[in-house]
UniProtKB/Swiss-Prot annotation:
Auto-ubiquitinated and ubiquitinated by RNF11. The gene is Wwp1. The WW domains mediate interaction with PPxY motif-containing proteins. This is NEDD4-like E3 ubiquitin-protein ligase WWP1. GO terms for molecular function: ubiquitin protein ligase activity; ubiquitin-protein transferase activity. Residues 1-116 form the C2 domain. The lineage of its organism: Eukaryota, Metazoa, Chordata, Craniata, Vertebrata. It comes from Mus musculus.
Length: 918
């Protein structure tokens, strides 16, 4: 029977499959360096079982050093395939190689222990088979023993004394057979040995008071897990005499060699102490040992039967081999130092060090009744060993308040701390890089003060009650009033009883203590502090005219009477679908009269508004698989390509088109809106690559890279064909006729980018989009929307919500600005002075949508969850404001005046388009 390294799964052992550790180290590929950044990975195929390594960023010399455990047989052929992973097309095969496991085992004497193999990678193309590089792999953890040799004729009779009874085995079927010896507690090992091997001392047993006992606890304990099987060692069976009775373990040569496991040295005492050590197998004792006064090691003795199996001529020379056991009493063999153990550190409690028949040191954990090859070390500081309710051992790290199944060592803890330190350094460097345009904290105190710097010779202090006062070092006096609020040095003094003060927004006003009144007019010259200075910026848009024209078309085509819609709140979606699809499209232009079953409400407009809100929340819910979120960082919707799983999906999209058209026709708003590219498709406008960034940033960046780089120099092999996966099914699509055979070059890559952009917006949703637009056009002709753009259509459909300025200010955070910074004061002044449409445009510019969550500004969502509206100080006063819709952040440069801030903000809101990356 073939044996190999121990495995945790005993079912594979019985089925003949063994575990092999395959370490894919590295590869050297004969290919040009790829600047596109493809990832390389290796695929290992073993009898239909496929395992893959991680992806390596190196395109010519990838390194993995990844260990894969596979189930093999001695006749298995390992197949290695090296692949190049691409984002825009299918993975490309770079080369493959095979390993005949049977041939490798024969080459390395049926033992694979860290065997390094250099495999030649090859690839078949139109020119034949070409060499594409080399792959380095390491095979480990597999040992195959010799096949059984049956030869009963040469086996002498064997007598085993057990409880005073003699058991004979001489090939006679009538005789009793020798019982099997237990190994590893579960798998029995045949007690026969081939003609070329003998039983090692790990299988020895002793007779104590006539009872047959194992020679060591290791016969019951399990062998160390994940360790290769020890080689068979030829040594003699031992015979110990206890209380006048002897026992011996002899082997027949008619069976195979079993799996051996490490065991402690066999010792026995009979008024004499004997310590045993490992000796080289099958070696004659020195001549001086025959007259030694001490009993030699039992493991060093070789019996006549075992000796004859190895060397037939050795019988005459070793007739007195058992006489060595009977030595004078009182002799003690001196303890021999174990050369293999140089570590003098004490073992933890409950651990024991032992040696197997090969002289290898292993360790026994009596706490868990397990063995291991690695020397146990005490737990690092702050760690604790515990056992859960199911008896499993785990370890608690009180330093980080975490748990793990793996026993920690000082080295593993040190490696983790080193990795954590490197990660913190990298994060610090990235933070410094991201803040390269920001101002230092020392500059913020003076610039954020709305009153500016103090006059020369003045100092601002705080007393013990945290009250601010000012010191005039010129006159050596103090005062509570801020000298900057009492007029400038070149201004005329205020009249008697007047004082200058400032509002929270930083606007100056005057207090007349004589009449106890306040005013914004300066009593010295009559000028108002709130007068709008500078040229007025024209702000005119035709949206109101467009909306009025659309409302006129709707009213002109409205039909008399009304149409009843009777629905239940529990089955709102299905009831509405059945009733709307049962009506004629022109009947949906009548005034709506909505009835909720079981409720007595009369619809004078309020129930219809609620019906539109609730139904839009239902039909656009991504859980129905009809729509999906357009991106990871927003909650706008687009058609889901996987909606085809519903056999009636086209009818539902036609219903949704009618419903959206009804909302526009009757002037109602829906709960959730679509993405801007979807609105452009409704308006029959051409979609550009800029529109792609808001829904698929990774795809957009890939196309931009192709546009800005020379793909021929990078060696990219792209064709006018693309693959798409929907519900696990991969389909191929040609961007143009015969595109799978047309190579993308520098001359035609612009056409390729345009076709890829068009395909990305329409992939898998052509029929759904057509059904939606057909249903929409039945109620509201699409020609009525030709004057609007996509942003105006979103405002019409989702509504222009009245913004709560107090809620907006209360849920706004500032970075490198404070609430009292003059730029922040000017910003909120600008928001208050503009109308609701400009506020919606500003909100859409910063957050990507003009709609707010149900909880207002406090529940604005960003890329990583809730993200409040943020204003950050970035750049110079000549820059335009920038927005980060993923984080709801506005980059507001430090403008010098309110007029400059207002001009830049309006220009950014109205005239800018698209996204960019810093």
């Amino acid at each position: 029977m073939a044996t190999a390294s121990p495995r945790s799964d005993t079912s594979d052992i019985h089925s003949g499959r063994l575990q092999l550790k395959v370490t894919v180290s590295s590869a050297k590929l004969k290919r040009k360096k790829n600047w596109f950044g493809t990832a390389i990975y290796t695929e290992v195929i073993v009898d239909g079982e496929v395992k893959k390594t991680a992806k390596s960023s190196s395109s010519s010399n990838p390194k993995w050093d990844e260990q894969l455990i596979v189930n093999v047989t001695p006749q298995t052929t390992l197949e290695f395939r090296v692949w190049s992973h691409h984002t825009l097309k299918a993975d490309a095969l770079l080369g493959k190689a095979t390993v005949d496991l049977k041939q490798v085992l024969l080459t390395h004497n049926r033992k694979l222990e860290k065997v390094k193999e250099q495999l030649k990678l090859s690839l078949e193309n139109k020119n034949g088979i070409v060499q594409t590089g080399e792959l380095t792999v390491v095979l480990d953890g597999l040992v195959i023993e010799q096949e059984p040799v049956t030869n009963r004729s040469s086996s002498p009779p064997i007598e085993i004394q057990q409880n005073g009874d003699a058991l004979h085995e001489n090939g006679d079927p009538a005789t009793r057979t020798t019982p099997r010896l237990p190994v590893e507690g579960t798998i029995g090992i045949d007690n026969h040995v081939s003609t070329n091997t003998v039983v090692p001392n790990s299988c020895c047993s002793h007779v104590v008071n006539g009872e047959n006992t194992p020679s060591s606890p290791s016969q019951v304990a399990a062998r160390p897990k994940n360790a290769p099987a020890p080689k068979p060692v030829t040594s003699a069976p031992t015979s110990d005499t206890v209380n006048g009775e002897s026992s011996s373990v002899l082997a027949d040569n008619t069976s195979t060699m079993g799996t051996l496991l490490p065991s402690e040295d066999t010792t026995s005492t009979s008024n004499c102490t004997s310590t045993t050590t490992q000796e080289p197998p099958v070696q004659e004792p020195p001549a001086s040992s025959e007259h030694s006064e001490c009993i030699p090691s039992a493991s060093a003795e070789v019996g006549p039967e075992a000796r004859s199996l190895i060397d037939p001529d050795s019988d005459s020379r070793n007739n007195s081999v058992f006489d060595k056991v009977r030595q004078p009493e009182g002799c003690v063999e001196p303890l021999r130092p174990q050369s293999g153990n140089t570590n003098t550190e004490a073992l933890p409690s409950g651990w024991e060090q032992r040696k197997d028949p090969h002289g290898r040191t292993y360790y026994v954990d009596h706490n868990t009744r397990t063995t291991t090859w690695e020397r146990p070390q005490p737990l690092p500081p702050g760690w604790e060993r515990r056992v859960d309710d199911r008896g499993r051992v785990y370890y608690v790290d009180h330093n980080t308040r975490t748990t793990t199944w793996q026993r920690p060592t000082m080295e593993s803890v040190r490696n983790f701390e080193q990795w954590q330190s490197q990660r913190n350094q990298l994060q610090g460097a990235m933070q410094q890089f991201n803040q390269r345009y920001l101002y230092s904290a020392s500059m913020l105190a003076a610039e954020n003060d709305p009153y500016g710097p103090l006059p020369p010779g003045w100092e601002k202090r705080v007393d013990s009650t945290d009250r601010v006062y000012f010191v005039n070092h010129n006159t050596k006096t103090t005062q509570w009033e801020d000298p900057r609020t009492q007029g400038l040095p070149n201004e005329e003094p205020l009249p008697e009883g007047w004082e200058i003060r400032y509002t929270r927004e930083g606007v100056r006003y005057f207090v007349d203590h004589n009449t106890r009144t306040t005013t914004f007019k300066d009593p010295r010259n009559g000028k108002s502090s709130v007068t709008k200075g500078g040229p007025q910026i024209a702000y005119e848009r035709s949206f109101r005219w467009k909306l009025a024209h659309f409302r006129y078309l709707c009213q002109s085509n409205a039909l008399p009477s009304h149409v009843k819609i009777n629905v239940s709140r529990q089955t709102l979606f299905e009831d509405s679908f059945q009733q709307i699809m049962a009506l004629k499209p022109y009947d949906l232009r009548r005034r709506l009269y909505v009835i909720f079953r079981g409720e007595e409400g009369l619809d004078y407009g309020g129930l219809a508004r609620e019906w539109f809100f609730l139904l839009s929340h239902e039909v656009l819910n991504p859980m129905y698989c009809l729509f999906e979120y357009a991106g990871k960082n927003n909650y706008c919707l687009q058609i889901n390509p996987a909606s085809t799983i519903n056999p009636d999906h086209l009818s539902y999209f036609c219903f949704i088109g009618r419903f959206i058209a009804m909302a526009l026709f009757h002037g109602k708003f829906i709960d959730t809106g679509f993405s801007l590219p979807f609105y452009k498709r409704m308006l029959s406008k051409k979609l550009t690559i800029k529109d792609l960034e808001s829904i698929d940033t990774e795809f957009y960046n890939s196309l931009i890279w192709i546009r800005d780089n020379n793909i021929e120099e990078c060696g990219l092999e792209m064709y006018f064909s693309v693959d798409m996966e929907i519900l696990g099914k991969v389909t191929s699509h040609d961007l143009k006729l015969g595109g799978s055979n047309i190579l993308v070059t520098e001359e035609n890559k612009d056409e390729y980018i345009g076709l890829m952009t068009e395909w990305r917006f329409s992939r898998g949703v052509q029929e759904q989009t057509k059904a939606f637009l057909d249903g929409f056009n039945e109620v509201v002709p699409l020609q009525w929307l030709q004057y609007f753009d996509e942003k105006e259509l979103e405002v019409m459909l989702c509504g222009m919500q009245e913004v709560d300025l107090a809620d907006w200010q209360r849920n706004t955070v500032y970075r490198h600005y404070t609430r009292n910074s003059k730029q922040i004061i000017w910003f909120w002044q600008f928001v208050k002075e503009t109308d609701n449409e400009v506020r919606m445009r500003l909100l859409q510019f910063v957050t990507g949508t003009c709609r707010l969550p149900l909880g207002g500004f406090a529940e604005l969502m960003g890329s990583n969850g809730p993200q409040k509206f943020c204003i950050e100080k970035v750049g110079k006063d000549t820059w335009l404001p920038r927005s980060h819709t993923c984080f709801n952040r506005l980059d507001l440069p430090p403008y010098k005046s309110y007029e400059q801030l207002k001009e830049k903000l309006l220009f950014a809101i109205e005239e800018t388009e698209g996204f960019g990356q810093e």
